[in-house]
Design a protein with these regions (language model features):
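Structural detector for internal amphipathic alpha-helices that build alpha-solenoid repeat scaffolds
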Residues: 2-18, 28-31, 37-51, 60, ...
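Amphipathic alpha-helical scaffolding segments comprising HEAT/armadillo-like alpha-solenoid repeats
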Residues: 17-30, 51-63, 84-95, 116-133, ...
Length: 168
C-alpha cells in the first residue's frame, strides 16, 4: 500500500490502466494527491470521462500556477481541446509570466488542435494573438532563437501576414 497525502492506492492501481478506473477514483486521485505525475495522468483520463470536471479543475490548476511549467503544459494539453476559448481566457487572466517551456507548448497545442478557420471564428482571437505577442517579446534573444521554427510554423498555420509577422 502506498500513501500519498490522504489518498491511498494499491500498487494494483498502478498496474491497471487509468482507463479502467471509475471517474470517482480519478477525481479522488486529483483532489487528494500531491504527486503531479499521478494528477496529470488522472486529469488526462478525466478529459475523456468527465469533461466538465476536467475543464473546471484544469482551469483552477492553470490560474493558480500549480506545480511547475511541465505540469501546466500537461494540464493545458488535456483541457484545451475541451473548450479552447475558456482555456485561452484562463491563460489571459493569469497574473504570472508564462515560462518558455509552457509558452512553446501553448503554441504547439494551438497549432495541432486549432485549424485556422476555427481560430478566426473565436470571438477574442485577436486578443489572444496580442497576448501571445506580448509574452513573446518578453523573452531574450536566446529564448526567441530556441523557438524560431515553432514561431514560423505558428505564423504559417494562422496566416499571420500582419503586423504580428513583423514582430515575430
Amino acid at each position: 500500500m502506498t500513501e500519498t497525502n490522504s489518498y491511498s492506492y494499491d500498487e494494483s492501481d498502478n498496474n491497471n490502466s487509468l482507463e479502467e478506473l471509475p471517474e470517482e477514483k480519478l477525481v479522488e486521485m486529483v483532489e487528494e494527491n500531491s504527486d503531479m505525475n499521478l494528477i496529470e495522468a488522472a486529469m488526462q483520463e478525466l478529459s475523456y470521462k468527465d469533461k466538465s470536471y476536467a475543464l473546471k479543475k484544469g482551469i483552477e490548476f492553470l490560474v493558480n500556477n500549480a506545480f511547475d511549467p511541465y505540469f501546466q503544459s500537461c494540464i493545458f494539453d488535456s483541457i484545451y481541446k475541451l473548450d479552447r476559448e475558456t482555456v485561452l481566457d484562463c491563460i489571459l487572466s493569469r497574473e504570472t509570466d508564462i515560462d518558455l517551456y509552457f509558452f512553446k507548448d501553448i503554441l504547439t497545442t494551438m497549432i495541432v488542435y486549432t485549424p485556422y478557420e476555427d481560430f478566426i471564428n473565436i470571438k477574442n482571437y485577436k486578443i489572444y494573438l496580442s497576448f501571445l505577442l506580448m509574452h513573446y517579446k518578453r523573452y531574450d534573444e536566446n529564448e526567441k532563437n530556441e523557438m524560431i521554427d515553432l514561431i514560423k510554423e505558428f505564423k504559417k498555420n494562422f496566416h499571420l501576414n500582419t503586423p504580428f509577422k513583423a514582430s515575430l
